[in-house]
Design a protein with these regions (language model features):
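DUTPase catalytic domain/fold
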Residues: 1-160
Length: 160
């Protein structure tokens, strides 16, 4: 496996092995792509923000969905990283891999570990995807194996 550079990502986009909608050149990084916030949900209060600014109380769990819809081919996976801007404000988040064959918006679980409220503007960049090439194509892609969250849109909480 190797991480794709910005030039590689452009080539994979042109070939259709990676799709990002909407795609913004300014979100492309030297080794990935920054995804932005479409929706924030605070499950404990059922507070949902789809515009303006989400207010996250101290020591509170929240869930973020991306504006971008991502689709990966058989040869590509994605690794998600929290932007350090948020980590420096006290946000902790848990991410997994984006499997080859996945299609949909992304949902992230996060936690305001600080003792202060945090404001999260809808539309701000929240995480980066580092795209990885697989040494060989996946024999079964995400949609063929489980596909639990295939084609999800918006905040999608855990499914059994």
């Amino acid at each position: 496996m190797s991480v794709l550079s910005d030039a590689d990502v452009r080539q994979y986009l042109a070939k259709g092995e990676i799709q990002i909608e909407p795609f913004e050149e300014s979100s492309l990084t030297p080794n990935g792509y920054d995804v932005s916030i479409e929706e924030v949900l605070v499950p404990s209060t059922r507070q949902k923000a789809t515009g303006g600014v989400a207010q996250i109380p101290p020591t509170t769990r929240f869930v973020v969905s991306t504006r971008e819809r991502v689709r990966l081919g058989r040869h590509v996976a994605g690794q998600i990283w929290l932007r350090t801007t948020w980590a420096r404000r006290g946000v902790i988040a848990s991410f997994g891999m984006i499997d080859a064959g996945f299609s949909g918006t992304l949902t992230f679980g996060a936690f305001n570990a600080s003792g202060d409220p945090i404001e999260i503007p809808i539309g701000d960049r929240f995480a980066q995807i580092a795209f990885l090439t697989l040494d060989s194509p996946a024999s079964e892609t995400y949609d063929q194996r489980s596909g639990t969250y295939q084609d999800q849109k918006g905040v999608t909480l855990g499914r059994p």
